[in-house]
């Protein structure tokens, strides 16, 4: 059987909403990632079979197949095809899994895959009139997050709960307290700050050159969202963000963010031929559907399905990255799967680092891969790692990798 390996994985810093990366177009962010991956591996770009990039919005500068735009902007040959994948929050991971399966099936030898999102630059949109020129008011939607142009039939059958309400639904169903959510959020920030200070992200984060108002340019090379000054007391004083007596707040939720991330995948045979040392083997992936109103539980059936496919158990997994859309959602997944919290998001998660939708799936896998590599010198190095995300409208996706080298 063909072996799929990951040779390199990188990401930009994750920018805050309206922060330093807000000045950079998403297609330029993605182009930087692709260009850097090729340069770091020193491969002939004509060897690349195809490029897959995830993106959740696609309503603004990321429209009309951003993967293709980024490929050309990266200076890569126009002969390389590219396609944009949309599974909302899991788009970046889906892109990687599609590429891995293509290699496994013998469709190609080398792929670039990942994801990008600029929530800061997401536009407002409103519908065209159905009959002639409109009079009166129009409803405009902020495309950075949530439903837009919801189908009335969809709403009547499944509801169109905002993402925060879906987290409230899980908090109620799994009896997750406000205190537990705030403690989890605090720990996410503290772990992320500790990882930044220790330089754990240095090998995965590439700097982004950002133009300034004075005409100069600066390099942005660090995640913007982690808060050094946060405390459980401060988090506990925040008001519920979605319902009056709720427990989900802005402090125990992920942010709206900007960023890009991608990996270089190839067959094991091609890696040997090019004298490239893989950092991990792609073991497998799985997706699953859940009720949209509890979309955050999606990683549970996706992970269970994947463990069955790979003949593994949660006891075999040494490190886990769960996208922290909300503390309530992540705690529900941990509880339902019976996971050891000590191996989950060891360097913080999206509550601290940020959640740049289409980028996040690739981002959590990139962080997982580099942490597994860093721990290779430990007395008991990790073997298997799991990356998983919940997905709006009720899905989950999971991927397992095996450390190499």
Predicted regions and their residues:
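Flexible glycine-/small-residue-enriched beta->alpha junction loops
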Residues: 110-169
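Active-site-proximal alpha-helical scaffold in enzymes
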Residues: 86-117, 171-200, 262-269, 334, ...
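Active-site pocket-lining segment
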Residues: 166-168, 201-204, 283-352
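Condensing-enzyme catalytic core mediating Claisen C-C bond formation in acyl metabolism
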Residues: 1-24, 36, 145, 150-152, ...
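Conserved catalytic cysteine-centered active-site region
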Residues: 55-111, 142-147, 157-162, 229-255, ...
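Conserved beta-ketoacyl condensing-enzyme motif
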Residues: 23-111, 115-135, 205-221, 293, ...
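N-terminal extracellular/periplasmic Venus flytrap/periplasmic-binding protein-like
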Residues: 11-12, 22-27, 31-32, 40, ...
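Short, well-ordered amphipathic alpha-helical segments that serve as non-catalytic structural scaffolds
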Residues: 26-42, 66-70, 95-98, 163-170, ...
């Amino acid at each position: 059987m063909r072996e799929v390996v990951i040779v390199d994985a990188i990401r930009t810093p994750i920018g805050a909403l309206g922060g330093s990366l807000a000045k950079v177009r998403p297609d330029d962010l993605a182009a930087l990632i692709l260009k850097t991956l090729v340069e770091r591996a020193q491969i002939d770009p004509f060897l690349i079979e195809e490029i897959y990039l995830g993106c959740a919005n696609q309503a603004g500068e990321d429209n009309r197949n951003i993967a293709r735009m980024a490929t050309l902007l990266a200076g890569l040959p126009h002969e390389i095809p590219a396609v944009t994948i949309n599974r909302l929050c899991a788009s970046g991971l889906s892109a990687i899994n599609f590429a891995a399966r293509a290699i496994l099936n013998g469709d190609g030898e080398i792929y670039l895959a990942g994801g990008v999102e600029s929530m800061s630059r997401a536009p407002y949109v409103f519908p065209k009139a159905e009959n002639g020129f409109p009079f009166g008011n129009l409803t405009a939607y902020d495309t950075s997050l949530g439903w837009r142009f919801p189908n009335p039939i969809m709403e009547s059958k499944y509801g169109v709960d905002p993402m925060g309400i879906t987290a409230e639904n899980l908090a109620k169903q799994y009896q997750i307290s406000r205190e537990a959510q705030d403690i989890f959020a605090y720990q996410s920030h503290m772990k992320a700050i500790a990882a930044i200070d220790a330089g754990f992200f240095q090998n995965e984060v590439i700097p982004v050159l950002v133009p300034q108002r004075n005409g100069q340019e600066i390099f942005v090379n660090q995640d913007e969202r982690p808060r050094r000054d946060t405390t459980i007391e401060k988090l506990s004083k925040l008001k519920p963000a979605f319902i009056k007596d709720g427990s989900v707040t802005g402090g125990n939720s992920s942010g709206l963010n900007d960023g890009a991330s991608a990996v270089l995948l190839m067959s094991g045979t091609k890696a040997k031929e090019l004298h490239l040392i893989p950092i991990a083997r792609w073991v497998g992936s799985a997706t699953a559907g859940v009720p949209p109103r509890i979309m955050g539980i999606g990683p549970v059936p996706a992970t269970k399905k994947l463990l069955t496919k790979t003949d593994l158990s949660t006891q075999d997994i040494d490190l886990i990255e769960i996208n922290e859309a909300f503390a309530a959602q992540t705690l529900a997944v941990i509880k339902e799967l019976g996971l050891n919290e000590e191996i989950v998001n060891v360097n913080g998660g999206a509550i601290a680092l940020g959640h740049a939708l289409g980028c996040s799936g690739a981002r959590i896998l990139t962080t997982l891969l580099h942490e597994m590599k860093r721990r290779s010198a430990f007395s008991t190095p990790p073997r298997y790692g799991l990356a998983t995300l919940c997905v709006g409208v009720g899905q989950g996706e999971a991927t397992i990798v095996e450390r190499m080298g």
